[in-house]
Amino acid sequence: MIKLRLKRCGRKQRAVYQIVAIDVRSPREGKALRKVGFYDPIKNQTDLNVRAILYFLEKGAQPTGTVQDILKKAEIDKELRPNQTKFN
């Protein structure tokens, strides 16, 4: 199963995160299938590849709680087709 989750980058006391599509059995810092976005919690900046995110969501990927909140804030959940299920 594929999940959209955060992968930690940056340095000590200055974390930034990549939003990646990754297999659930992989470790947090493991090899990702594809990078689909970027999140900086200190500056509160996000950069999302909407096309790639929608592709993985249509294929059945599940976002983690934090990624789900980021996607809702960016209003990506409104771009899902009506017949597609919403986030859990």
Swiss-Prot record:
UniProt record, GO biological process: mitochondrial translation
Gene Ontology, cellular component aspect: chloroplast; mitochondrion; small ribosomal subunit
Paired cysteines (S-S): none
Extent of the signal sequence: none
GO molecular function, one term: structural constituent of ribosome
Family: Belongs to the bacterial ribosomal protein bS16 family.
Protein name (database record): Small ribosomal subunit protein bS16c
Species annotation: Jasminum nudiflorum
